[in-house]
A protein has these predicted regions:
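Transmembrane-helix boundary motif in ABC transporter permease subunits
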Residues: 31-61, 73
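Conserved small/polar residues in nucleotide/adenosyl-binding loops
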Residues: 151-159
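Hydrophobic alpha-helical transmembrane segments of multi-pass integral membrane proteins
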Residues: 1, 29, 33, 37, ...
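Alpha-helical membrane-protein architecture signal
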Residues: 14, 18, 52-56, 92, ...
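Generic hydrophobic transmembrane alpha-helix motif, especially the helices
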Residues: 61-101
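Short cytoplasmic-facing helical segments at TM-TM junctions of multi-pass membrane proteins
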Residues: 109-148
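N-terminal, non-cleaved signal-anchor transmembrane helix
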Residues: 1-33, 88-91
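Alpha-helical membrane-interface segments at transmembrane helix boundaries
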Residues: 18-30, 60-64, 145, 149
Length: 160
């Protein structure tokens, strides 16, 4: 009646463990890169757009309060139905769930770093006539890097 369920051949052989570990690392890496891009973009817009800030932070707070496991059935069903009969749907679902498990905290961390940056640092970029692009790459991203990295590691520590 419905779409065929993907046939997943999982071998119990010890020889396959490195391959399965590699797949897990790739999933985590892809989800991390997507989370980082989203968190930086979302946090930057929320920090520098006063009109959108209150709404964006409220949405982020609501999304952060929803447990990741509550997304599991819907996400996996949606991904398997979008790409029926393929392993890709399950992999995309796993990546999306890893993404939702870490992105909200990373976005809050980046936003908080931008909001708590000392005024003197911003003034220094004005004195040296940095463009917005230079200010982002040479001040804001490095300044928030430690907080975002720590948040990412803290999220994984709690998930494992």
């Amino acid at each position: 009646m419905g779409h065929p369920v993907p046939a997943i051949a999982i071998s119990p052989s010890a020889k396959m463990l490195p391959l399965y570990a590699f797949y897990s690392v790739v999933r985590i890496g892809v989800a991390y890169l997507l989370s980082l891009v989203f968190a930086v973009g979302y946090g930057y817009i929320a920090a520098y757009n006063p009109r959108a800030e209150s709404f964006m932070i409220a949405v982020l707070d609501i999304l952060q309060s929803i447990p990741v496991l509550s997304f599991l059935p819907g996400v996996m069903l949606a991904m398997v139905s979008l790409i029926p009969g393929r392993q890709l749907g399950i992999e995309m679902g796993a990546i999306l769930l890893i993404f939702t498990g870490q992105v909200w905290n990373m976005a809050f961390s980046f936003y908080s770093s931008l909001k708590s940056m000392p005024r003197e640092l911003r003034e220094a970029t004005s004195v040296f006539r940095f463009s917005a692009w230079q200010r982002f790459w040479q001040l804001e991203l490095p300044y928030s890097g430690i907080a975002v990295s720590y948040t990412h590691l803290d999220v994984y520590k709690r998930q494992v």
